[in-house]
Curated annotation (Swiss-Prot):
Record's keyword terms, sorted: Apoptosis, Early protein, Host-virus interaction, Inhibition of host caspases by virus, Modulation of host cell apoptosis by virus, Protease inhibitor, Thiol protease inhibitor
Family named by the database record: Belongs to the protease inhibitor I50 (p35) family.
Pfam families hit by this protein: P35 (PF02331)
Biological process terms in GO annotation: negative regulation of apoptotic process; symbiont-mediated suppression of host apoptosis
Gene Ontology MF terms: cysteine-type endopeptidase inhibitor activity; cysteine-type endopeptidase inhibitor activity involved in apoptotic process
Record has DNA-binding as a keyword: no
Keyword ATP-binding: no
Function: Blocks the insect or worm host cells apoptotic response initiated by the viral infection. Confers protection from cell death in mammalian cells. Acts by blocking the activity of members of the caspase family of proteases.
Protein name: Early 35 kDa protein
């Protein structure tokens, strides 16, 4: 999940799609729809990506709904209303510029050493935001061990108008890896809020990584005395599912002996073995874990 400045900008739930294009190329769609009626100054956002960007295009807002529906459909199948049972290029940096946006992609080490200069090349000069980014964001974005690429995006006033508020990035992944950018800026509380949906195709299943993520999820607070938060690690012929859900029991209004068991707020990872596609839903949950998911590609 990228970091956005200024912080008063209101954005919708993050929606991510990362898909295979050809043997050397993937397409990342990263959507943080701006909800404010009008931008009065540029908006800065950054996120990790597993290779250099080769092109940037704007796409129609309808794409967000199509991706969201695809992910929601998978998780809706987990939830039930009734059950009989509850289970336990300057400086060698390439820039992509348009009237309403500016994008660059560079190694983390390059971004760290030339941070202010790169932002100036994007016509971004908000001193307070730059200082905050250097303190809270760069340590999370720049991995000294892997030196991941970082996409820098500046959205300019006017970007929020019209029907093409979605940016699509074609990039060349390095090391046969796909980075799903969930990481946040570092904060003083050590607790991170997630509200993101993601669809990623042509990747390997990574149960260990998904288990770590789900086990640390904190679901919304309780509203029923019989409520339980249960952890699932299930496998079927076609799917692997690792998720948490909120489950509780209610009594029938007509026959007191009848019990209704509910499963809601399913959050986690669903992997389709046949299509080799990953579906992720982290909706209004918190966690002490703050990291990206990094997956092996299937070519």
């Amino acid at each position: 999940m990228c970091v956005i400045f200024p912080v008063e900008i209101d954005v919708s739930q993050t929606v991510i799609r990362d898909c295979h294009v050809d043997e050397q190329t993937r397409e990342l769609v990263y959507i943080n729809k701006i909800m404010n009626t009008q931008l009065t100054k540029p908006v800065l956002m950054m996120f990790n990506i597993s290779g250099p960007i080769r092109s940037v295009t704007r796409k129609n807002n309808d794409l967000r709904d199509r991706i969201k529906s695809k992910v929601d459909e998978q998780f809706d199948q987990l939830e039930r209303e009734y059950s009989d049972k509850i289970d336990g290029f300057h400086d060698n940096i390439q820039y992509f510029k348009d009237e309403h946006y500016s994008v660059s992609c560079q190694n983390g080490s390059v971004l760290k050493s030339k941070f202010a200069k790169i932002l100036k090349s994007h016509d971004y000069t908000d001193k307070k935001s730059i200082e905050t980014y250097e303190k809270y964001c760069l340590p999370q974005l720049v991995d000294k061990h892997n030196d991941c690429y970082v996409a820098v995006c500046v959205l300019k006033p006017g970007f929020e108008n019209g029907s093409n508020q979605v940016l699509s990035f074609e990039y060349n992944p390095i090391g046969n890896k796909v980075i799903v950018p969930f990481a946040h800026e570092i904060n003083d509380t050590g607790l991170y809020e997630y509200d993101v949906l993601a669809y990623v195709d042509s990747v390997e299943f990574d149960g260990k990584q998904f288990e770590e993520f789900v086990q640390k999820l904190i679901l919304p607070s309780s509203f029923n005395d019989s409520e339980k938060v249960l952890y699932y690690n299930e496998a079927s012929k076609n799917k692997n599912m690792i998720y948490k859900a909120l489950e509780f029991t209610t009594e029938s209004s007509w026959v007191k002996s009848n019990k209704f068991n509910w499963k809601i707020f399913c959050n986690g990872f669903i992997y389709d073995k046949k299509s080799k596609a990953l579906y992720v839903k982290l909706h209004n949950v918190t966690s002490t874990l703050n990291k990206n998911v990094i997956l092996d590609m299937i070519k």
